[in-house]
Amino acid sequence: MLVLFGLSCCVRGCLNACKHYSQDSISASSQPLDSIQQHALWVDSLLSQPHVPIAVRERPSGRFVTRFRTEQIFMDSFPDLNDVQLATAQRLGIPAVADREEASRLRNRLVYVGECPYYLVDKLTYSTPYLVPRAARLLEEICHGFADSLMSRGMPLYRPVVTSLLRTQADVARLRCVNGNASEQSCHQYGTTFDICYNRFVRVIDPADTLTKDVWPGELKALLAEVICDHRQKGTCYVKYEIYQSCFHITAR
């Protein structure tokens, strides 16, 4: 557990090193702030608050009660379509870039997203591991909150899998060759958007724990949904529940 929280400090330090970029770039604009930018400044202030530690306790008997019991409830709870997310992504993200070479020239505006204590990054075929600072902070907060929820219930720790991050125009074109449902106007092109798989979780092995059983995947999915739903209700993100891609499609606001 000490290793987990020690590594978290490293992750937090990397994000704090560039956390003021998005705030400064918005504040430095000579134009009046629109509603999207004003909301983004509020989200930045919210995400910059220290993460409050939780008390770890023994797992209570029985399953936890969740509102997420059917596919329809998931879809109704996360209804934010592409056009809603796209307007925010275009306003707050980087310009869409043609290819990864061009994206590399914007790395001073991006945060590298790699494996961390709270999530794993899948092998990325159609995206590259970068996000704007606000989105990177949001991703960590969601997955940190998921770990907190597990520990507060006495469950073993699991890490969700991130399956998509920044996409170039070339990435989008290649993806559309194999996935006809992929949008040409992808929010992923602006570095504000990421996908978290809802049916793949990797357990954090504790050598000292030989008794705790694995958690049912549906229970993990519902618990992750609870955390993401809380963030959406706070106004930190837009979320679409993707059935065919088996992921939560999330854009930082």
Can you say where each PLM-predicted feature lies in the sequence?
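Extended, low-complexity, intrinsically disordered C-terminal regulatory tails
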Residues: E140-C143, A147, M155-C177
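Catalytic cores and adjacent binding grooves of peptidoglycan-active enzymes
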Residues: S183-R253
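Hydrophobic membrane-insertion alpha-helices, especially the h-region
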Residues: M1-G13
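Second-shell loop/turn segments in exported
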Residues: V121-R134, P160-V162, D206-G218, T251-A252
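N-terminal low-complexity, intrinsically disordered segments
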Residues: R59-R100
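Stable alpha-helical elements in mature extracytoplasmic
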Residues: H39-W42, P60, L131-L138, I142, ...
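Active-site acidic/histidine clusters and adjacent loop/turn architecture
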Residues: L106-M155
